[in-house]
Amino acid sequence: MDQPTAAQPTIRRARPEERDAIARLLGEAFMDDPVSGWVFPDETHRRTAHPRFFGVMLDAALREGWVDVSEDVSAAALWLPVPAEEAHGTGSTADDPDAGAHDGSDRDGDGDDGGEPTDETAELLAAADPGNERVVTVARLTGEAHPTGTAHYYLPAVVAAPCRQSAGLGGALLASALDRCDRERMPAYLEASNTRSKALYERLGFVFCGRTVDLPGGPSLWPMWREPRA
Protein backbone atom coordinates (compact mmCIF):
# COMPACT_ATOMS: atom_id res chain seq x y z
CA MET A 1 0.00 0.00 0.00
CA ASP A 2 1.27 3.45 -0.85
CA GLN A 3 1.72 5.88 2.03
CA PRO A 4 -0.39 9.03 1.64
CA THR A 5 1.12 12.49 1.55
CA ALA A 6 -0.46 15.90 1.59
CA ALA A 7 -0.77 15.70 -2.20
CA GLN A 8 -1.37 11.98 -2.59
CA PRO A 9 -4.51 10.11 -1.50
CA THR A 10 -4.19 6.62 -0.09
CA ILE A 11 -4.23 3.95 -2.81
CA ARG A 12 -4.70 0.30 -1.93
CA ARG A 13 -5.57 -3.04 -3.52
CA ALA A 14 -9.28 -3.76 -3.90
CA ARG A 15 -10.85 -6.35 -1.62
CA PRO A 16 -13.08 -9.14 -3.00
CA GLU A 17 -16.12 -7.87 -1.12
CA GLU A 18 -15.81 -4.52 -2.92
CA ARG A 19 -16.40 -6.04 -6.33
CA ASP A 20 -20.03 -4.94 -6.74
CA ALA A 21 -19.32 -1.40 -5.55
CA ILE A 22 -16.50 -1.07 -8.07
CA ALA A 23 -18.70 -2.43 -10.87
CA ARG A 24 -21.33 0.19 -10.06
CA LEU A 25 -18.66 2.88 -9.98
CA LEU A 26 -17.43 1.88 -13.44
CA GLY A 27 -20.93 1.76 -14.86
CA GLU A 28 -21.84 5.18 -13.52
CA ALA A 29 -18.63 6.96 -14.42
CA PHE A 30 -18.61 5.71 -18.01
CA MET A 31 -22.19 6.72 -18.79
CA ASP A 32 -20.99 9.77 -20.75
CA ASP A 33 -17.86 8.19 -22.18
CA PRO A 34 -17.74 8.60 -25.98
CA VAL A 35 -16.89 4.96 -26.67
CA SER A 36 -19.59 3.70 -24.32
CA GLY A 37 -22.03 6.02 -26.08
CA TRP A 38 -21.07 4.47 -29.40
CA VAL A 39 -21.26 0.88 -28.14
CA PHE A 40 -24.56 1.49 -26.31
CA PRO A 41 -26.26 4.38 -28.15
CA ASP A 42 -29.51 4.19 -26.18
CA GLU A 43 -28.92 5.84 -22.81
CA THR A 44 -31.55 3.83 -20.95
CA HIS A 45 -30.16 0.57 -22.28
CA ARG A 46 -26.61 1.72 -21.54
CA ARG A 47 -27.50 2.30 -17.91
CA THR A 48 -28.83 -1.25 -17.66
CA ALA A 49 -26.02 -2.94 -19.59
CA HIS A 50 -23.09 -1.06 -18.08
CA PRO A 51 -22.87 -2.81 -14.69
CA ARG A 52 -22.86 -6.23 -16.38
CA PHE A 53 -20.47 -5.10 -19.08
CA PHE A 54 -17.93 -3.60 -16.72
CA GLY A 55 -18.48 -6.39 -14.23
CA VAL A 56 -17.01 -8.88 -16.67
CA MET A 57 -13.99 -6.64 -17.24
CA LEU A 58 -13.59 -6.15 -13.51
CA ASP A 59 -13.74 -9.87 -12.85
CA ALA A 60 -10.96 -10.43 -15.40
CA ALA A 61 -8.75 -7.89 -13.65
CA LEU A 62 -9.48 -9.37 -10.22
CA ARG A 63 -8.74 -12.84 -11.53
CA GLU A 64 -5.74 -12.23 -13.79
CA GLY A 65 -4.28 -8.88 -12.75
CA TRP A 66 -5.08 -6.39 -10.01
CA VAL A 67 -7.43 -3.54 -9.13
CA ASP A 68 -6.27 -0.44 -7.27
CA VAL A 69 -8.80 1.74 -5.46
CA SER A 70 -8.91 4.87 -3.35
CA GLU A 71 -9.56 4.30 0.34
CA ASP A 72 -13.28 5.09 0.00
CA VAL A 73 -13.61 3.18 -3.31
CA SER A 74 -14.60 6.34 -5.17
CA ALA A 75 -11.91 5.70 -7.78
CA ALA A 76 -10.48 2.54 -9.32
CA ALA A 77 -7.94 1.37 -11.89
CA LEU A 78 -7.98 -2.06 -13.52
CA TRP A 79 -4.74 -3.64 -14.71
CA LEU A 80 -4.07 -6.81 -16.67
CA PRO A 81 -0.72 -8.49 -17.40
CA VAL A 82 -0.23 -9.28 -21.09
CA PRO A 83 2.34 -11.93 -22.06
CA ALA A 84 4.68 -11.21 -24.95
CA GLU A 85 2.81 -13.55 -27.28
CA GLU A 86 -0.65 -12.06 -26.73
CA ALA A 87 -2.57 -8.95 -27.68
CA HIS A 88 -5.16 -7.88 -25.15
CA GLY A 89 -7.75 -5.33 -26.07
CA THR A 90 -11.35 -4.40 -26.27
CA GLY A 91 -11.51 -0.75 -26.37
CA SER A 92 -10.00 0.43 -23.22
CA THR A 93 -11.12 3.04 -20.90
CA ALA A 94 -8.20 4.93 -19.79
CA ASP A 95 -9.46 8.31 -20.45
CA ASP A 96 -9.12 11.32 -18.30
CA PRO A 97 -8.06 9.49 -15.13
CA ASP A 98 -10.23 11.73 -13.02
CA ALA A 99 -13.25 10.95 -15.12
CA GLY A 100 -14.49 7.80 -16.72
CA ALA A 101 -11.61 6.71 -18.76
CA HIS A 102 -11.81 4.92 -21.90
CA ASP A 103 -8.41 4.42 -21.87
CA GLY A 104 -9.27 2.08 -21.59
CA SER A 105 -12.71 1.31 -23.16
CA ASP A 106 -11.80 -2.14 -22.76
CA ARG A 107 -14.55 -4.14 -21.56
CA ASP A 108 -12.31 -6.93 -21.19
CA GLY A 109 -12.34 -8.81 -24.37
CA ASP A 110 -9.38 -9.98 -26.31
CA GLY A 111 -8.45 -9.52 -29.88
CA ASP A 112 -6.37 -12.56 -30.73
CA ASP A 113 -3.63 -11.22 -32.97
CA GLY A 114 -6.23 -8.94 -34.50
CA GLY A 115 -8.38 -11.87 -35.55
CA GLU A 116 -11.68 -13.10 -34.26
CA PRO A 117 -12.76 -11.96 -30.80
CA THR A 118 -11.69 -14.46 -28.16
CA ASP A 119 -13.56 -16.07 -25.29
CA GLU A 120 -13.33 -12.92 -23.17
CA THR A 121 -15.26 -10.97 -25.78
CA ALA A 122 -17.81 -13.74 -26.13
CA GLU A 123 -18.25 -13.64 -22.36
CA LEU A 124 -18.82 -9.91 -22.52
CA LEU A 125 -21.43 -10.27 -25.21
CA ALA A 126 -23.27 -12.96 -23.30
CA ALA A 127 -23.12 -11.15 -19.99
CA ALA A 128 -23.72 -7.59 -21.11
CA ASP A 129 -25.44 -7.22 -24.44
CA PRO A 130 -26.01 -10.31 -26.58
CA GLY A 131 -26.25 -9.51 -30.26
CA ASN A 132 -24.63 -6.09 -30.01
CA GLU A 133 -22.26 -6.12 -32.98
CA ARG A 134 -20.59 -2.92 -31.82
CA VAL A 135 -19.06 -4.79 -28.90
CA VAL A 136 -17.56 -7.21 -31.42
CA THR A 137 -16.33 -4.33 -33.57
CA VAL A 138 -14.59 -2.43 -30.79
CA ALA A 139 -12.98 -5.66 -29.57
CA ARG A 140 -11.72 -6.52 -33.04
CA LEU A 141 -10.35 -3.06 -33.83
CA THR A 142 -8.60 -2.59 -30.50
CA GLY A 143 -7.24 -6.12 -30.70
CA GLU A 144 -5.74 -5.37 -34.10
CA ALA A 145 -4.01 -2.28 -32.71
CA HIS A 146 -2.73 -3.85 -29.50
CA PRO A 147 1.08 -4.35 -29.54
CA THR A 148 2.45 -7.87 -29.44
CA GLY A 149 5.88 -9.32 -28.82
CA THR A 150 6.61 -7.57 -25.51
CA ALA A 151 5.16 -8.42 -22.11
CA HIS A 152 3.42 -5.43 -20.54
CA TYR A 153 0.68 -4.23 -18.21
CA TYR A 154 -2.56 -3.10 -19.82
CA LEU A 155 -4.87 -0.48 -18.34
CA PRO A 156 -8.42 -1.21 -19.54
CA ALA A 157 -10.05 1.31 -17.21
CA VAL A 158 -9.28 4.04 -14.71
CA VAL A 159 -12.14 6.01 -13.25
CA ALA A 160 -13.25 8.34 -10.49
CA ALA A 161 -16.81 8.91 -9.33
CA PRO A 162 -18.34 12.01 -10.95
CA CYS A 163 -18.45 13.78 -7.58
CA ARG A 164 -14.72 13.13 -7.00
CA GLN A 165 -13.28 13.98 -10.40
CA SER A 166 -11.36 17.02 -9.20
CA ALA A 167 -9.79 15.30 -6.20
CA GLY A 168 -6.71 13.95 -7.97
CA LEU A 169 -7.68 10.34 -7.37
CA GLY A 170 -7.13 9.19 -10.93
CA GLY A 171 -3.65 10.66 -10.96
CA ALA A 172 -2.83 8.98 -7.66
CA LEU A 173 -4.02 5.63 -9.01
CA LEU A 174 -1.83 6.00 -12.08
CA ALA A 175 1.20 7.11 -10.08
CA SER A 176 0.94 4.03 -7.90
CA ALA A 177 0.72 1.61 -10.83
CA LEU A 178 3.37 3.32 -12.93
CA ASP A 179 5.74 3.19 -9.98
CA ARG A 180 5.24 -0.57 -10.00
CA CYS A 181 5.88 -0.65 -13.75
CA ASP A 182 9.15 1.21 -13.24
CA ARG A 183 10.26 -1.06 -10.40
CA GLU A 184 9.52 -4.17 -12.44
CA ARG A 185 10.89 -2.69 -15.68
CA MET A 186 7.54 -3.38 -17.32
CA PRO A 187 6.02 -1.32 -20.15
CA ALA A 188 2.41 -0.13 -19.92
CA TYR A 189 -0.28 0.21 -22.58
CA LEU A 190 -3.67 1.91 -22.80
CA GLU A 191 -6.06 3.54 -25.25
CA ALA A 192 -6.94 7.19 -24.66
CA SER A 193 -10.41 8.17 -25.81
CA ASN A 194 -9.91 11.90 -26.29
CA THR A 195 -7.15 14.42 -26.94
CA ARG A 196 -7.30 15.78 -23.39
CA SER A 197 -6.52 12.41 -21.86
CA LYS A 198 -3.91 11.76 -24.56
CA ALA A 199 -2.06 14.90 -23.49
CA LEU A 200 -2.28 13.89 -19.84
CA TYR A 201 -0.84 10.45 -20.55
CA GLU A 202 1.95 11.98 -22.58
CA ARG A 203 2.97 13.92 -19.48
CA LEU A 204 3.17 10.59 -17.64
CA GLY A 205 5.54 9.14 -20.22
CA PHE A 206 3.12 7.47 -22.63
CA VAL A 207 3.76 7.83 -26.37
CA PHE A 208 1.09 7.64 -29.07
CA CYS A 209 1.62 4.49 -31.11
CA GLY A 210 1.03 6.41 -34.34
CA ARG A 211 -2.35 5.22 -35.58
CA THR A 212 -5.78 5.83 -34.10
CA VAL A 213 -8.47 3.19 -33.68
CA ASP A 214 -11.42 4.70 -35.54
CA LEU A 215 -14.84 3.31 -34.68
CA PRO A 216 -17.14 3.35 -37.74
CA GLY A 217 -19.16 6.54 -37.60
CA GLY A 218 -17.99 7.09 -34.04
CA PRO A 219 -15.10 8.31 -31.88
CA SER A 220 -11.43 7.46 -32.12
CA LEU A 221 -9.07 5.89 -29.60
CA TRP A 222 -5.37 6.71 -29.27
CA PRO A 223 -3.26 3.62 -28.47
CA MET A 224 -0.40 4.66 -26.17
CA TRP A 225 2.71 2.88 -24.88
CA ARG A 226 4.99 3.71 -21.98
CA GLU A 227 8.47 2.32 -21.46
CA PRO A 228 9.51 2.00 -17.80
CA ARG A 229 11.51 4.86 -16.38
CA ALA A 230 14.85 4.33 -14.69
Regions found by a protein language model. Give the residues of each.
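A short beta-loop-alpha structural element at the N-terminal edge
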Residues: T10-R24, E28
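Conserved active-site alpha-helix within GNAT-family acetyltransferase domains
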Residues: G171, R183-R185, N194-R211, G217
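C-terminal "cap" of GNAT-fold acetyltransferases
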Residues: M186, L190-T195, D214-A230
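Conserved acyl-donor/pantetheine-binding loop and adjacent beta-alpha core of acyl/acetyltransferases
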Residues: A76-Q165, L215-P216
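Helix-loop element at the rim of GNAT/NAT acetyltransferase active sites that forms part
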Residues: R24-E43
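Conserved GNAT acetyl-CoA-binding A-motif
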Residues: A151-Y153, R180-S193
